[in-house]
């Protein structure tokens, strides 16, 4: 059947709700009433393709209807003089140097990864790459921040085993990313049982483009031709955005059908083809066919340019020849790009597509006016006002701020810190990520200067940020870091988000760069609940306040709601991807100790608070009070560490696992031990000083020959000399009493193999 009419004008409220459920539209009663009223005004009943197109455009995933009000309120006007495009197209664009710009974006692929972990994660990588490519940029780096369930437990109330999800997600990222030739260089992995049924897969991509080759995601002029380039169109991914805009309840045939099928062997030539065409200057506009498929891509692109479109689906190459018109229109089949060219350039674009063995279809024409018409087999299946399609309802949802009591629960001190330390380094959230990251190719393209690990051969440790050299003839580099602190945000959404951003800044600064831009992926539960909406609003407010304070542009973002299962929400998880600039990549710093007899300094005021720390959580303490980070102190750290970089041999921020894990990881990268005394850090208990994770602290390794200059120049900051490097043991004392004395290798062995049983 090509199409059928739906008699919506005669439907009552119950009929409208039943129709929304029956067709998988995920529209509310009020939204269905608005659709009914539109067609009453038009004097006709809709065709099925029109109803599905509206549902796609009005989905939470595509329209941001629950978040747009607050995003505009708090994140507008966060541009800088070096911002080229922010919150306008498929990705953000920021100046790199006088001739080039870098392009960046982060997206979530959460619901698909919960139902089909391998495929969901793989298509998340493919989609984020196309978001960057459609701006005309060559992808140069992939990023993925993963939030997984409790893989250590065999008991779970979830759709799938958390361990199965974890292994599938990593496998999907590995197989897609490695096959398209883009290095996977940065990210994070965090574990908590709240993610058992709702894993979070936040994928990011960075690209590089000449400024005169930036492509917009909005139509250029009437008369241009719309083309479809890439893979074939099938039934995979139908209603994908509707599925991602609702609460996950069970795995069904419809939910599996909503998962897109990725094919990196098509993605790579598609990427090469459109970049080749862009280099020739024939692409006037371009948009990735991701969520919502052709329906969303075509509607959004022509509407953004102030035009309409006349489209025919007859030339589209199909996987299933019996597909109906509405299925073709909303299919979310992957590896497809909507391209706009001048009429005289159609044949040239076709030649390029055929050269790369890609499917090529002529869709139609950009026209004056605000109407979109779509035909299939000589039948008109869509004839609608684009403004109605693209202007989904915007909700100012009510919210309640969390009432945070200023109380802190203090866990008891370990009886034996040596035994405790050996167990602590092997915990899921402290252990090495080698088992995950070594599956990814992080050196392809030959531009990775500092990878996700750094250190001496066979003694690598975690990097704070990675460093990419995008251009062959320039030493200027990009620094990349990504992650979230849901353990903090769940206690205090505002201060916890500030802590997430503070850590990102310290990661960039520790590696030798200066923060330059921000993108986010905001993952929360059901926005129809006021407490969840309160988490979201406070988190977005924090991002706005922080970025204004530090003059950082927020250039792109993504919101993922409805991450709940059986009324259990995930921890609020605002993931931040931050990019920094370094003028000379040869000056980049790494995290591992470089030599014996170096002086170890702690920079920044101690937070002295265990709330949200891994130490507290392993003692089953999940509440508390989180002090706001001192942002003025952080600004001074950026200035001083950047200005006096030659004094610093290595640096590592204090975050997950506290001061203890920061020092241990610095030791793990070279095998060089250390001897420190906690007495000068603060007056708090030893466990608080060792395992507190909040605040702005950074550990610095200082060459003794520069120590005098260092202390003089850093006198405006809180700095404490806590010890020196040397030997092959980790020795921690306090006021002359020994607390920890262990071989570096013994601790490293536990840390390195912490994930072995799970992946």
Swiss-Prot record:
Residues annotated for ATP binding in this entry: 64, 105, 520, 557
Gene Ontology BP terms: 'de novo' IMP biosynthetic process
Main location: cytoplasm
Pfam families from the UniProt entry: AIRS, AIRS_C, FGAR-AT_linker
Keyword Nucleotide-binding included in the entry's annotation: yes
Binding sites annotated in the UniProt record for Mg(2+) 1: 107, 558
Binding residue positions for substrate: 108-111, 130, 260, 332-334, 560
Sorted UniProt keywords: ATP-binding, Cytoplasm, Ligase, Magnesium, Metal-binding, Nucleotide-binding, Purine biosynthesis
A GO molecular function held by the record: phosphoribosylformylglycinamidine synthase activity
Residues passing through the membrane, by range: none
Pathway assigned in UniProt: Purine metabolism; IMP biosynthesis via de novo pathway; 5-amino-1-(5-phospho-D-ribosyl)imidazole from N(2)-formyl-N(1)-(5-phospho-D-ribosyl)glycinamide: step 1/2
Disulfide bonds listed in the record: none
GO CC terms: cytoplasm
Matches recorded under InterPro entries: PRibForGlyAmidine_synth_PurL, PurL_linker, PurM-like_C_dom, PurM-like_C_sf, PurM-like_N, PurM-like_N_sf
Residues of the active site: 61, 109 (proton acceptor)
Subcellular location, record wording: Cytoplasm
EC number: 6.3.5.3
Family membership noted in the UniProt record: Belongs to the FGAMS family.
Function: Part of the phosphoribosylformylglycinamidine synthase complex involved in the purines biosynthetic pathway. Catalyzes the ATP-dependent conversion of formylglycinamide ribonucleotide (FGAR) and glutamine to yield formylglycinamidine ribonucleotide (FGAM) and glutamate. The FGAM synthase complex is composed of three subunits. PurQ produces an ammonia molecule by converting glutamine to glutamate. PurL transfers the ammonia molecule to FGAR to form FGAM in an ATP-dependent manner.
Quaternary structure note: Monomer. Part of the FGAM synthase complex composed of 1 PurL, 1 PurQ and 2 PurS subunits.
Protein name: Phosphoribosylformylglycinamidine synthase subunit PurL
